């Protein structure tokens, strides 16, 4: 029926300030942002209903029969790379883990490293750019700290130094795909 569904666009602050008890919010994103939304004074005071999907742990799994040179192997490399670089990996549906049979680890590492090395990082308004910045300096530091920690615990696949295009490093928060 008319009015059963409304889509209102604007900044989150403006939207949450204008919610009423009859409204419901569906949010997909980080648990931290969901907590901020849930605790917004207007959301609490008006008992706004919320549906939250937060911090997904999406996985890519490579089967032992998907060997280098196969279509499945190529698709796995393409999709893992795409998930790492689209929106700089900052989307709730991004792959967070890739499970690879030990026998295929060297092949996957080499193929993924080669693909990531070709990733152009910079201002996403430039058509040649395939990976933009992370959201802010705090996130950039968190990601870099996590990378540094992981380097002490695991084998890292590095995309090399990012090839920055139309990027202002004083304003943008760029990280090489890792």
Describe the predicted segments one by one.
Residues 4, 21-27, 31-177:
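ALDH superfamily catalytic-core signature
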Residues 1-11:
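PLP-dependent aminotransferase-like
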Residues 14-15:
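Short acidic active-site motifs
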């Amino acid at each position: 029926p008319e009015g059963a569904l409304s889509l209102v666009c604007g900044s989150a602050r403006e939207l949450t300030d204008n919610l009423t008890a009859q409204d419901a919010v569906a949010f997909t994103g980080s648990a931290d942002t969901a907590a901020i939304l849930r605790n917004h004074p207007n959301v609490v005071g008006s008992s706004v209903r919320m549906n939250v999907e937060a911090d997904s742990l999406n996985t890519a799994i490579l089967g032992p029969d998907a060997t280098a040179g196969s279509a499945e192997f190529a698709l796995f490399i393409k999709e893992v790379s795409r998930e790492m670089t689209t929106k700089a990996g900052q989307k709730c549906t991004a792959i967070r883990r890739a499970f690879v049979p030990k026998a295929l680890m060297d092949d996957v590492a080499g193929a993924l490293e080669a693909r990531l090395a070709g990733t152009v990082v910079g201002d996403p308004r430039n058509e040649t750019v395939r990976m933009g910045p992370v959201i802010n300096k705090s996130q950039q530091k968190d990601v870099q700290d996590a990378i540094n920690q992981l380097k002490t615990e695991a084998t890292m696949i590095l995309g090399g130094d990012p090839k920055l295009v139309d990027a202002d490093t004083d304003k943008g928060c760029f990280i090489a795909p890792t």
